[in-house]
């Protein structure tokens, strides 16, 4: 959530930042809300002051043996007015907060303005796409030929945009997951976390999925208001909700492997074939909780950790700086990593690494203790390290052989019992 002080006192500054996203707030509407809030606040304070003065007056009159009934009746009326004013003020503040919760984060000054992915900026490329001397297959054909990737079975079990993996492909996906977690925990300094796959609404509000993006979530029916997680970012980042962390504990760095569940609302007709866009997919997520002055450096580090996985697997990719209009709701700066997909002759997103600044921390009331008296909001970051299903398809396509078998990247062979290929 954006700092309420900015919304109250510098709405033009907010609009100047949001312009990079192509978003503008109604200045007059916010000015009107602030005027009403100030008027109600002032009215409440004046009534409270009048009540306090009256209480003293009643005490003095009673002390002198006089009749204070008239003033006491007035105090009763003032009390009723105060209650009404407080209710009105609370309702207005709630209205303002709900509106504020739907405002996206302000882009960092280094983020380019732009409307969509066409305005993103390519930062770098790594690796050279392989030149095949035979007709290649996409991962769907490869998987079905091997008998290890079944979409029809998944459709029978559940519906569209689900998949079933069997045999060597299921083991290869597990190998990828283990390799990612081992790299992040043993080499990159993250603490592994196992988390619930169901979260409550407070957790989703904390990280910004609610209230604006409820249609993208799967919600359980029943007495409890539980949602399936869209990413491990939600439960892991909420570790620090309503917490005050000692400064010497920062940074906190977590890595978690979970399934992710997304309704893919608005994506009808897009990527209907294969593993690119699924309702359920696995991901290894990195989360960092840091001091504000280190968050931009932490973003570079976290992104490099995701890049390290791709480099170790020998998968060509490019690094993209997202423009304001293509960034996620809560991000102040985002890098996307896009892996080379031979069958599509293009790069596709495999990781998104974001600095959220204090946007989530303000919603979560997550702070750190600077000294005995002063606390400050932490900054939060998250990134895919990596999306496992998309990494699997990238390995399948980039390492395919003419006979339909798939070479196993060297770093994965210890997780595959020493095997060098699968067929």
UniProtKB/Swiss-Prot annotation:
NCBIfam families: serS. HAMAP family: Ser_tRNA_synth_type1. The gene is serS. L-serine binds at residues 231-233, 285, 384. It comes from the Bacteria. One of its GO terms (cellular component) is cytoplasm. Catalyzes the attachment of serine to tRNA(Ser). Is also able to aminoacylate tRNA(Sec) with serine, to form the misacylated tRNA L-seryl-tRNA(Sec), which will be further converted into selenocysteinyl-tRNA(Sec). Its EC number is 6.1.1.11. GO terms for molecular function: ATP binding; serine-tRNA ligase activity. Consists of two distinct domains, a catalytic core and a N-terminal extension that is involved in tRNA binding. Homodimer. The tRNA molecule binds across the dimer. Keywords: Aminoacyl-tRNA synthetase, ATP-binding, Cytoplasm, Ligase, Nucleotide-binding, Protein biosynthesis. This is Serine--tRNA ligase. It is found in: Cytoplasm. It comes from Acinetobacter baumannii (strain AB307-0294).
């Amino acid at each position: 959530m954006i700092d309420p002080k900015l919304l109250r006192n510098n709405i033009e500054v907010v609009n100047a930042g949001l312009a990079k996203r192509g978003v503008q707030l109604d200045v007059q509407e916010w000015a009107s809300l602030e005027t009403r809030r100030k008027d109600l606040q002032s009215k409440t304070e004046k009534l409270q002051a009048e009540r306090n003065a009256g209480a003293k007056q009643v005490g003095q009159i009673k002390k002198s043996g006089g009749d204070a009934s008239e003033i006491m009746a007035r105090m009763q009326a003032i009390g009723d007015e105060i209650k009404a004013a407080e209710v009105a003020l609370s309702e207005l503040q709630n209205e303002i907060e709900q509106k504020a919760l739907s405002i996206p984060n302000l882009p960092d000054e280094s983020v380019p303005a732009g409307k969509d992915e066409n305005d993103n900026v390519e930062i770098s490329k790594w690796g050279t796409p392989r030149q095949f001397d035979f007709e290649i297959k996409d991962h769907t054909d490869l998987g079905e030929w091997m008998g290890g990737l079944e979409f029809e079975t998944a459709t029978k079990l559940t519906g569209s945009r689900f998949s079933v993996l069997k045999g060597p492909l299921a083991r290869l996906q597990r190998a990828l997951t283990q390799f990612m977690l081992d790299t992040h925990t043993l080499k990159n300094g993250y603490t592994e976390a196992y988390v619930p796959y169901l979260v409550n609404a407070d957790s989703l509000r904390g990280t910004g999925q609610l209230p604006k993006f409820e249609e993208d979530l799967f919600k359980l029916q029943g007495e409890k208001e539980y949602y399936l997680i869209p990413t491990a970012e939600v439960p892991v980042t909420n570790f620090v909700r309503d917490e005050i962390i000692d400064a010497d504990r920062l940074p906190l760095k977590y890595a978690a492997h979970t399934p992710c569940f997304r309704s893919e609302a608005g994506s009808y007709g897009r990527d209907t074939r294969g593993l690119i866009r699924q309702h359920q997919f696995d991901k290894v997520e990195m989360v960092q909780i840091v001091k504000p002055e280190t968050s931009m450096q932490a973003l570079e580090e976290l992104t490099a950790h995701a890049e390290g996985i791709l480099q170790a697997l020998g998968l060509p990719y490019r690094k993209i700086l997202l423009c304001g209009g293509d960034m996620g709701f809560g991000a102040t700066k985002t890098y996307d990593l896009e892996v080379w997909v031979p069958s599509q002759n293009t790069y596709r997103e495999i990781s998104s690494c974001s600095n959220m600044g204090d946007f989530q921390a303000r919603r979560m009331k997550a702070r750190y203790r600077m000294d005995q008296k002063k606390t400050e909001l932490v900054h939060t970051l998250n990134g895919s390290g990596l999306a496992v299903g998309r990494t699997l398809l990238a390995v399948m396509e980039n390492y395919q052989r003419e006979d339909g078998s798939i070479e196993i990247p060297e770093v994965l062979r210890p997780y595959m019992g020493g095997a060098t290929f699968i067929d």
